């Protein structure tokens, strides 16, 4: 048969659109033509495939070979199509039966010797192959990752000879059995490591229970970074769908095998990070820090030291849970449902309000420092907390109830109430959801309106305050929001919202 079709997958953002590799052999002068909008790395695959086929002991057909990567309008890059191209040529030349390739998708880069090398973005391709009802042929190094798509038949190969023997029926490979190494997660740091700071720990529990954004303000050395690093351990475990989304992003963005799955990500970019580094971008858009923090925590230390323009691009993803990057050729959408935790000093030197009087910053310097953060950005942060310096104690006694396990139990119970009631965390309630789930008595409503007027809170800040109060009620397993919940929620709002 002079025509063969092999299925593969491209990599576009965190998605894996289907690519059909069509191979046709015709009479004429020997030549190999590759069409279908291939980029440089794909064009170079012609030479890799020829050498791999010959060095594996197979015949490279001395005919006019046309390879079409369909659809033609989808850009293709990388060496992920090498294996599919080689199998297509062998099937079209009759060296393996073409019918054996009908229910399999192939991914893998070929070495000149015929060895099959790993590729990036295998998990999105595995999920797409499972949805299409086909098996997936992958390099052995990617097999564990592909097996995360439960129910998918994964065939792992190390060399082109193995793949050909399998499809020719000489040595049929059994589906790969995952060893489960990827399902081991690293332990989170414990909350008991933080000395004192009871109010800050309370704010962490509230933030975890309702998925609220959090801002710590305080002098250096008070434990702001230490506190933020404890938040992922308080969050509920990822469900299977969330874990697969996180793993798919890591699969696309990382050049190393997946580790620590399922684990909530904790990202801490440096304050010199650019806009594309934070939200994603480039000529070929890549996921940024907010996407890498999907279903996890994005920690911005020294918040005012970030470029103001960089911080402003966070506003839309904080509301929508995704980021759209537009380029001349296409638009790419990346998920970005992250929980923001930020830390900052109260002034440029960091010691404003210290009893020692070390601060020498002028009011103008302090105002200029705080003006680096816009009102709309601060409005989107639900919990604002000042972290004061505690009495120095090098070996404090551990509080028995001050552990991550105890706090995580409270958070899990509150989250369960929210999921049963409205299907999402309180922070993600839309306006109709706020009106339905955050109802107040007439007296409490009037009291809250008066408080918001005195504190000059915006309507958005008032709605976020109601969500925090709803979370406080859930932590106490209370059905209705009470005055004490509103009063505590007000404590976490700055006076100029």
Tell me the role of every PLM-derived stretch:
Residues 1-215, 219-226, 326, 462, ...:
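Peripheral, non-AAA+ core regions of ATP-driven protein-machinery
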Residues 26, 57-60, 97-99, 129-131, ...:
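Conserved catalytic network of the ASCE P-loop NTPase/AAA+ motor domain
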Residues 112, 298-299, 305-306, 392:
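Residues immediately C-terminal
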Residues 205, 259-265, 270-298, 330-331:
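Conserved alpha-helical scaffold flanking the Walker A/P-loop in AAA+ ATPase domains
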Residues 215-258, 320:
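Walker A/P-loop
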Residues 218, 280, 302:
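The Walker A (P-loop) glycine that initiates the GxxxxGKT/S ATP-binding motif of P-loop NTPases
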Residues 295, 301-302, 313:
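Walker B catalytic acidic pair
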């Amino acid at each position: 048969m002079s025509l063969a079709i092999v299925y593969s997958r491209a990599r576009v953002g965190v998605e894996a659109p289907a690519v059909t590799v069509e191979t046709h052999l015709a009479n004429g002068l020997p030549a190999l033509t590759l069409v279908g909008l291939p980029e440089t790395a794909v064009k170079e695959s012609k030479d890799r495939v020829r050498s791999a086929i010959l060095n594996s002991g197979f015949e490279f057909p001395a005919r006019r070979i046309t390879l079409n990567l369909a659809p033609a309008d989808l850009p293709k890059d990388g060496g992920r199509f090498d294996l599919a191209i080689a199998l297509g040529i062998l099937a079209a030349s009759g060296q393996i039966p073409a019918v054996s390739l009908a229910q399999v998708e192939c991914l893998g880069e070929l070495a000149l010797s015929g060895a099959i090398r790993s590729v990036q973005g295998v998990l999105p391709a595995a999920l797409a192959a499972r949805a299409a009802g086909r098996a997936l042929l992958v390099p052995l190094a990617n097999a564990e990752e592909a097996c995360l798509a439960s129910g998918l038949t994964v065939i792992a190969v190390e060399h082109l000879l193995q793949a050909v023997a399998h499809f020719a029926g000489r040595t049929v490979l059994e589906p790969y059995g995952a060893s489960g190494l990827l399902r081991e997660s690293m332990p989170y740091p414990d909350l008991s490591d933080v000395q004192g700071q009871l109010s800050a720990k309370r704010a962490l529990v509230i933030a975890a229970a309702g998925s609220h954004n959090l801002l710590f303000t305080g002098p250096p050395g008070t434990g702001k970074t230490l506190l933020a690093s404890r938040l992922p351990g308080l969050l509920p475990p990822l469900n299977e769908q969330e874990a697969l989304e996180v793993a798919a992003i890591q699969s696309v963005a990382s050049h190393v095998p997946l580790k620590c799955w399922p684990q909530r990500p904790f990202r801490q970019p440096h304050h010199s990070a650019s806009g594309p580094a934070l939200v994603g971008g480039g000529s070929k858009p890549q996921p940024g820090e907010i996407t890498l923090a999907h279903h996890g925590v994005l920690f911005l230390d020294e918040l005012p030291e970030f470029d103001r323009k960089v911080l402003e691009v966070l506003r839309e993803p904080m509301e929508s849970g995704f980021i759209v990057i537009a380029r001349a050729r296409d638009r790419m959408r990346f998920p970005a449902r992250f929980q923001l935790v930020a830390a900052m000093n109260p002034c440029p030197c960091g010691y404003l309000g210290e009893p020692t009087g070390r601060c020498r910053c002028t009011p103008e310097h302090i105002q200029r420092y705080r003006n680096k953060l816009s009102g709309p950005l601060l409005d989107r942060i639900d919990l604002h907390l000042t972290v004061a310096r505690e009495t120095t104690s090098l070996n404090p006694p551990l509080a028995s109830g001050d552990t991550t396990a105890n706090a995580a139990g409270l958070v899990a119970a509150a989250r369960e109430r929210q999921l049963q009631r409205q299907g999402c965390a309180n922070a993600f309630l839309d306006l109709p959801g706020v009106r339905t789930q955050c109802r107040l008595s007439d007296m409490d409503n009037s009291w809250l309106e008066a408080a918001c007027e005195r504190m000059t809170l915006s309507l958005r800040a008032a709605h976020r305050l109601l969500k925090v109060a709803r979370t406080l009620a859930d932590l106490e397993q209370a059905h209705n929001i009470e005055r004490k919940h509103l009063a505590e929620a007000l404590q976490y709002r700055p006076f100029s919202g």
